[in-house]
Amino acid sequence: MHTPIASKGTSGPSRRVEPGMTSPAIVYTRTGDSSVLEPKDREVTEPAAGEVRVRVVVSGVNPTDWKNRTGSGPGEKLAFDEVVPNQDGAGVIDAVGPEVEGLAVGDRVWVYLAQHQRPTGTAQKFTNLPASRVVALPDGVSFDVGASLGVPAMTAHRALTVSEDGPSRLHPGALEGKSVLVAGGAGAVGHAAIQLARWAGATVVTTVSGPEKGALATAAGAHHVVNYKTGDAAADIRELVPGGIDLVVEVAPAQNAALNAAVGANRASVAVYANNGGDTITLDVRPNMVLNTRYQFVLLYTVGDEALRNAEADVSAAAAAGVLDVGEATGLPLHRFPLSETAAAHDAVENGTVGKVLIDVSSE
C-alpha cells in the first residue's frame, strides 16, 4: 500500500478540463526504431479513482524506454492501440481523482514506472497515473533531478540493498564499513549508485573505460576510479581494497564475471541490473563457491511493492539532502531535447550518450 505523503498543494477540488481539450504528446502504434514515434494532440481526461493527473515539466529517458519501443522486432502488435513512451518524469499535480490521499493539486512531484503495463508515459504534457507511482519532490530539488530519479536511482537503491546481510534501507551509515564496486560508474544507474553508496557510508570503487568517464565518476563521489582498459583491473582493485569487495553493482555481468570473482570478499553479492556485453554469463564455480558469492538480478518492474516503497522513501531523502544532483559538476552531464524531438532523445540514449537525456515538456 502506498504511504501517504505530506502535501503542500491545495486540498480543494481538482481542476476540470473542458470537453475535447487536448495537449501535445508523442505516441507510437507499432514497435520499431525511433521513426515510429509521432506527434499527436491527445485528449486530456479526468483522473480515475486512485489516480492523479500530472502536468509534466521534464520527462526522463532511459534505455528501457527505447527497448520497450523496439520490442523484439519491428511491427509487433502492442498491448494498447497507442503508447506514450517514457517511464520517468517530474512535474506538478493538476488534478486528483477520488480515493487519493496525501496528494493535492499544485504539489511538485516525481513519477516513476508511468508507462509500465499502461499506455501513457511521460512524453506528453498531461498524464494520468496511479497515485502509487507519484512521489512528493522535496523542497529545493529541481525538476531535472526529479525526472532522473525513477529508473536510475531506484534501480541503484535496489542493487545496494540485496546483500545477504542487508541493509534493506539506505541512509547515512547504512553501508559503513562496506566496500562497493560500481561497474560503469559514468552511466545513469552507476552514477546514482556511486552517490547513494557514498551517502550510506561505503567505500566506493568504480571501473570506467577512459579518463573522461573517470572524471565524471570522481565528480559523482567515487573514492577510487579504475580504468579497466589500461591495466590489471583486478590487481588495482585488490590493492585499493585489500579485504575485497562486499557488493558489486553490475552492468556487464558477461564481461565482468571473472573480475568479480577475483576481487570479491567472502560472501560478496553481485547485483546485476543490465546485460551490457552479452546475455550469457559463464561462472567459474570454484572461486565463487569458495567466496560464497551471491548473484542477485534486479529489474525494477518486478521487485515488488516493498522494495519500491523503500526506494521511494530513501531516494527522496537522498535527493532532499542534495545527494542525487545531476549535471556536469556532479558527474552526469545533461542532454536536453524538446518534446517534438523525442525520437532524437531516444536515439541519444540508444547510441550510448554519456549523461542523462531529458525532454523539456512544459514550463515550470
Predicted regions and their residues:
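C-terminal hydrophobic helical "lid"/dimerization subdomain
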Residues: 2, 15-21, 307-364
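Mid-domain Rossmann-like dinucleotide-binding core that forms the NAD(H)/NADP(H) cofactor-binding site
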Residues: 147-230
